[in-house]
């Protein structure tokens, strides 16, 4: 189907050169939109969007979200912020500023141009939860002073700003809480468990497990996550969130490590290290609301998604 340039929605994606943002760029372009990718390349990577640079309906702007920017757009997906402990703890002050000032700047832009805006929040707003699985009405159990607080509290403050702009200024917002997401284009040195395990297995190195390995996470494949985000953005204005997006299938770190070893054919052994402070023991979303409102749930099983991710890292490590 051919799209006239005048029929295309102009969509801004902050953090668009990152893992999740680049997949969102792909999908929104395929859907016939004009996409503006904004990134400062702190964790985003140009190689994630190289295949899009010749597309006449794709634009890249190098910009730091802590500074305002003036554009004419119809929709804004606000993804920009380091999302792994290795990256967000490297410069915790900058992490908090990116979440808070970035939200202020993007909400100000949305208010000015009357754009619809989606905040990519996080399951980290639940902290180390005492409620399991986590529902959107749960307020969380979060340390305000721990080493993860720069990310957790920054995202919580961003949510507050979104709802205040919605109530006070009638900005058309959406808020999604994203649980652990994985897939091709994950940063190889971001310290996330799936990328760590895969790279260690492919290199035949010990697979490092922090703690006893019985702590759990739920892992959602990136294509499923992108679908959920777009459905939320395009949904009716009578529901603005927050909305959990994630895979309700729970997996322990020991189970994940064994599955990665099996799929890679690796002979890696397990190595246990002390658990980091404030590391949640369990994390699993209740996605009843996403099912009810948007008929959304993940369709990619863990083995299938891991295999695609392993294939990506094999190619990356081989230099091809």
Identify what each model region corresponds to.
Residues 43, 184, 247:
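Short, conserved catalytic or interaction motifs in soluble domains
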Residues 90-91, 185-190:
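Short, solvent-exposed loop/turn segments at secondary-structure boundaries
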Residues 3-4, 24, 105, 180, ...:
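C-terminal substrate-binding subdomain of Rossmann-fold SDR/epimerase-dehydratase oxidoreductases
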Residues 157, 161-165, 197, 256, ...:
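Hydrophobic alpha-helix immediately C-terminal to the catalytic Tyr-X-X-X-Lys motif of short-chain
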Residues 44, 71, 188, 251, ...:
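Residues that form or flank phosphate/diphosphate-binding pockets in enzymes
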Residues 132-133, 188-196:
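A glycine/serine/threonine-rich, flexible loop-to-helix segment
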Residues 150, 158, 190, 253, ...:
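Conserved donor sugar-nucleotide recognition element shared by glycan-biosynthetic enzymes
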Residues 1-181, 223, 296, 308, ...:
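N-terminal Rossmann-like NAD(P)+-binding domain of SDR-like oxidoreductases, especially those catalyzing
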């Amino acid at each position: 189907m051919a799209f006239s340039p005048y029929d295309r929605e102009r969509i801004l994606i902050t953090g668009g050169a990152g893992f999740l943002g680049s997949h969102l760029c792909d999908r929104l372009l395929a859907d016939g939109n004009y996409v503006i990718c904004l990134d400062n390349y702190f964790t985003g990577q140009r190689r994630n969007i190289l295949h899009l640079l010749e597309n006449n309906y794709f634009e890249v702007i190098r910009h730091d979200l802590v500074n305002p920017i003036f554009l004419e757009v119809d929709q804004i997906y606000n993804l920009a912020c380091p999302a792994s402990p290795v990256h967000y703890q490297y410069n915790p002050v900058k992490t908090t500023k990116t979440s808070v000032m970035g939200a202020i700047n993007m909400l100000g832009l949305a208010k000015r141009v009357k754009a619809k805006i989606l905040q990519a929040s996080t399951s980290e707003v639940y902290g180390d939860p005492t409620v399991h699985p986590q529902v959107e009405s749960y307020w969380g159990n979060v340390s305000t002073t721990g080493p993860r607080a720069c990310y957790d509290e920054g995202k919580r403050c961003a949510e507050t700003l979104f709802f205040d702009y919605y109530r006070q200024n009638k900005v058309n917002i959406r808020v999604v809480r994203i649980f652990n997401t994985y897939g091709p284009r994950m940063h190889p040195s971001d310290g996330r468990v799936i990328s760590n395990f895969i790279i260690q297995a492919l290199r035949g190195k010990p697979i490092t497990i922090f703690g006893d390995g019985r702590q759990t996470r739920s892992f959602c494949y990136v294509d499923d996550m992108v679908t959920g985000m777009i459905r939320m953005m395009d949904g009716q204005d009578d529901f603005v969130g927050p909305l959990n997006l994630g895979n309700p299938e729970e997996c322990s770190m020991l189970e994940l490590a064994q599955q990665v070893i099996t799929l890679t054919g690796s002979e890696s052994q397990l190595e246990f290290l002390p658990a980091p402070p404030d590391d949640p023991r369990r994390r699993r979303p209740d996605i009843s609301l996403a099912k009810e409102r948007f008929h959304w749930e993940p369709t990619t099983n863990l083995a299938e998604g891991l295999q695609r991710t392993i294939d990506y890292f094999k190619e990356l490590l081989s230099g091809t």
